[in-house]
Amino acid sequence: MKERPGNPVPRVCETPSGILNCVGLQNPGVDAFIKDDLPFLEKSGTVIIANIAGSAEEDYVETVSRLNGTSVDMIELNISCPN
């Protein structure tokens, strides 16, 4: 819901058995997204899917509440990413 700067670099590390990442879900926050990013996306003529993450149930409820009534077509809950 709030702005997140993400984790400091390096965010990705290649190992012999695969790749590790710890991106930190960098984003401007839901209010800035609605104000600054959504108008641009609306002009694209494509389906708009908002992927939201939170630390507690209340974060998800509040973020969805703020997105309701906007031009977002779908909301995806990111409940599996520990970042």
Annotated model-derived regions:
Residues 1-83:
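Flavin-dependent oxidoreductase catalytic cores
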